[in-house]
UniProtKB/Swiss-Prot annotation:
Residue positions where Phosphothreonine is found in the record: T335
One of the record's GO cellular component terms: cytoplasm
Domain BRCT: residue ranges: 1-93, 644-734, 755-837
Keywords in alphabetical order: Cytoplasm, Cytoskeleton, Phosphoprotein, Repeat
Record's protein name: Microcephalin
Length: 840
């Protein structure tokens, strides 16, 4: 019978916690369903009852407008316990948000985890509509398909089939079928292995003239290590072909593209060296050392040809032929241009960090080499084979090329380094001007990381992110050559722009790398540092060793101990170049200190356009001292502001009691807006106002009365918000419920010093029992604030407050805690006879 007591009820449940974060509707929904009621998920016209607690204001308004019965959760509980339909008027719902101002709307956010239900067309209406729409669209496409349109189908095995709906004697359809059949037959050979390619090259040597053009644009380039064989891709790198590897072969779509890629290697070999018998396409997979030895010798011969030492008539003839053939076959791949009869191939890579501007010229002749150098040769051979365009002939490079192999490799490890960034854009720059023939032009590779670090050590980093400026790197030039020599006027300048942070390295490693590279070390056009130096006289017997700087230890100590008091614009002179070098080597530590102590604004205020040399510019110590002084000046006003007391929290505090969380949030927002108060959880010596949501006798209200605070209603805050400032408190004082509040407040205002009441001043010494409620500390504080005296031991007291389990004396009064509370509320000592505890 209990299952049908609410059979005529259609309920809509909206039950939330008072703070609006917990939704308890599901519990009461279950109870209503158990009693036979129907529960609606939406507030529709069939709803007869709304179970409401701390719900939305819109639900409340809609229910009142429709005349639906608004009941509290107690009605549901009473119906369940009584087993009958209880009258709804006995349990009306209460809307606590009805008096809140409409301008403050708090968005509810339920913190409870939702039950995850997998969406299906059966339980989700939106998903069902979407599913039906897709089914209709699919059916429409099937019906609208013309009968004469052939269909291409992909079977489960992955093969492509041609399925015409009706047989049409059309040449187009038969051609399509024939073409698809050819593709299916060739499918097994779309990605041949290296051995298959070598076999095809042996079977059909006439294909070495590359009859099939490459269909690969220069935007579809692949990385340098995409081809596992390494034989063809590494040599294609030498020829400037950046689009090699498996990806390139897949893009072609047929075997002709693969043969075309294979032919490039043999074509270049035949064009550059007609007498070269072994071609790279004829190499076996089992002979990597032979391949590497060929590559090493060809690299050396190529260097010698670039230097203009060995060029045979056959090679000159082959160079002309290669240029003509390459321009014909490479229309879609790397950009080709020739300068004064020399071939220049430039490719623009998209992602590889190794492939840069590439130039191929000269002859290749096989010889022996080492297998372990395969990777380093592949990664660093082309940067040293670059040719720069000039009016006369190729720029000459002094010294062997293989010496700089290890140093040259590091320059291209970081694709996003400043020099590589400029190298990628260098093809848009104008060609460099002719330089004096007496100077050795460094134009074969970029600076390595260690060399860049050495220059960074002597650079002023205060202008990072600003416009470019020019600095003199005379001392760096001297360090690179291990002999302090001065450059010609204007020739020792370098443009320092877009400086990025690099890992600092030891000065010895920097010098060793620069010295090992010898005179080949230089950078291409626009690489960030382009400079020339004189050919220094190296002392005999010191091919790779370095002489330590004399007296460097003492000079470093002097540099570290130096404290300059000059301004930013002044310069400090250094007596000799060794001292300048020692200072430069130890500058990074000062940079770190400066970065730690200097703010961003101070970095921007440091001199950014200073163009003096390393020797003449202000030392790092000057900049450090000046910037730190400026930083101290910058923070002085903040320290003075703290000392002066401005910016402190307000001295007055406001305490809320008997107030739900929604109203507390409103009070906090109003206090933040109108200022003048800070919120405190409990009444203390700084409290001046106590806000009570309901006229209940709480500890905060009692402590507020005892301290002479304003005890106000919640409306005072709302009216203050309405008027935009704190208004008078008297109209909102709860004097009817707490008559002692205005009396104690008046006494507090009239007292000269700290206020202390006189209510219990004439009473004997009291002892508060540890088992009392409110807690002992709060009760003792109340008695003390009202002028009473509290003892720590019961034998000294004449009045014992609270339950006492010890031996009782006839001369001592044992009173309830309510005696203290009622006396404070009424502001008079109540008769003790009404509060005596029973004697046991």
């Amino acid at each position: 019978m209990a299952a049908h007591i609410l059979k005529d009820v259609v309920a809509y449940v909206e039950v939330w916690s008072s703070n609006g974060t917990e939704n308890y509707s599901k519990t009461f929904t279950t109870q209503l369903v158990d009693m036979g009621a129907k529960v609606s998920k939406t507030f529709n016209k069939q709803v007869t009852h709304v179970i409401f607690k701390d719900g939305y204001q819109s639900t409340w308004d809609k229910a009142q407008k429709r005349g639906v019965k608004l009941v509290s959760v107690l009605w549901v509980e009473k119906c369940r316990t009584a087993g009958a339909h209880i009258d709804e008027s006995l349990f009306p719902a209460i809307n606590t948000n009805e008096h809140l101002p409409s301008l403050i709307k708090k968005k509810r956010k339920c913190m409870q985890p939702k039950d995850f239900n997998f969406k299906t067309p059966e339980n989700d209406k939106r998903f069902q509509k979407k599913f039906e729409k897709m089914a209709k669209e699919l059916q429409r496409q099937k019906t609208s398909l013309d009968d004469d349109v052939p269909i291409l189908l992909f079977e489960s095995s992955g093969s492509l089939t041609y399925s015409p709906t009706i047989k049409i004697n059309s040449s187009h359809h038969s051609a399509m079928e024939k073409r698809l059949q050819e593709m299916k037959e060739k499918r097994e050979n779309l990605s041949p292995s290296s051995s298959q390619m070598i076999q095809q090259s042996h079977d059909n040597p006439s294909n070495s003239l590359c009859e099939a053009p490459l269909n690969i644009s220069r935007d579809t380039l692949c990385s340098d290590e995409s081809f596992a064989g390494g034989v063809h891709s590494s040599f294609d790198d030498l020829c400037g072909n950046s689009g090699c590897g498996n990806q390139e072969r897949k893009l072609g779509g047929s075997i002709n593209d693969i043969e075309s890629d294979m032919c490039i290697s043999s074509l270049v070999l035949k064009a550059n060296n007609i007498h070269s018998s072994p071609s790279f396409t004829h190499l076996d997979k089992s002979s990597p050392q032979k391949f590497l030895s060929n590559l090493s010798k060809e690299e050396i011969n190529l260097q010698r040809n670039i230097a203009g030492k060995i060029v045979t008539p056959d090679q000159k003839q082959a160079a002309g032929m290669s240029q003509e053939t390459f321009e014909e076959k490479y229309r879609l791949s790397p950009t080709l241009s020739s300068t004064k009869g020399h071939l220049l191939i430039r490719s623009r890579p998209s992602s590889s960090s190794v492939k840069r501007q590439r130039v191929s010229h000269g002859s290749h002749s096989p010889s022996k080499g080492k297998s372990k150098r395969k990777r380093s040769i592949r990664r660093s051979i082309m940067p040293r084979l670059q040719l720069c365009r000039s009016e006369g002939s190729l720029q000459h490079v002094a010294g062997p090329a293989l010496k700089a192999l290890s140093c040259g490799e590091s320059s291209y490890d970081d694709y996003f380094s400043p020099d590589n960034l400029k190298e990628r854009n260098s093809e848009n720059l104008p060609p460099t001007s002719q330089l004096p023939s007496s100077l050795a032009q460094f134009s074969c590779r970029s600076l390595s990381k260690k060399e860049r670090t050495s220059i960074f050590e002597m650079s002023d980093f205060s202008c990072i992110g600003k416009k470019t400026r020019t600095v003199d790197i005379t001392s760096f030039t001297a360090k690179t050559i291990s002999s302090p020599q001065k450059t010609a006027n204007g020739e020792g300048r370098a443009t320092l722009s877009c400086v990025t942070s690099e890992e600092s390295s030891a000065p010895g490693e920097t010098l060793r790398c620069c010295r090992q590279a010898g005179k080949e070390d230089a950078c291409p056009e626009g690489n960030g540092f382009s400079y020339t130096i004189e050919d220094p006289p190296f002392p005999k017997g010191h091919d790779g060793d370095l002489t330590p700087l004399e007296g460097s230890l003492e000079e470093v100590k002097e540099a570290v101990g130096l404290k300059s008091t000059q301004n930013k614009g002044t310069t400090s002179k250094i007596s000799n170049s060794s001292e300048g070098e020692a200072q430069s080597e130890h500058e990074p530590c000062f940079i770190v200190d400066c970065n730690m102590e200097t703010s961003t604004e101070e970095k921007e205020n440091l001199p950014g356009g200073y163009g003096g040399s390393v020797k003449n510019r202000p030392t790092r110590h000057d900049l450090l001292d000046d910037s730190c002084d400026s930083f101290k000046d910058l923070i002085k006003p903040h320290e003075e502001l703290k000392k002066s007391g401005r910016g402190k929290k307000p001295t007055r505090t406001l305490v809320m009691t008997s107030m739900p969380s929604e109203k507390q949030n409103v009070v906090i927002q109003v206090v933040d807006k109108l200022k003048g108060f800070s919120i405190a959880p409990d009444v203390c010596e700084t409290t001046t106002h106590v806000l009570s949501g309901k006229p209940l006798r709480t500890l905060n209200v009692l402590l507020g009365i005892a301290r002479g605070c304003w005890v106000l209603s919640y409306d005072w805050v709302l009216w203050s918000l309405e008027l935009g400032h704190w208004i008078s408190e008297e109209p909102f004082e709860l004097s009817n419920h707490f008559p002692a509040a205005p009396l104690c407040r008046s006494e507090c205002h009239l007292s000269a010093g700290p206020y202390r009441g006189t209510l219990f001043a004439d009473q004997p010494v009291m002892f508060v029992s540890p088992a009392s409620s409110p807690p002992v500390a709060k009760l003792c504080e109340l008695v003390h604030l009202c002028g009473g005296r509290v003892s720590q031991v019961p034998r000294q007291a004449s009045i014992v407050i609270g339950p006492y389990s010890g031996k009782k004396k006839a001369t001592v009064k044992y009173l309830s805690e309510k005696w203290v509370l009622d006396s404070i509320i009424q502001h008079k000592v109540c008769a003790s006879e009404n509060y005596l505890l029973p004697q046991r």
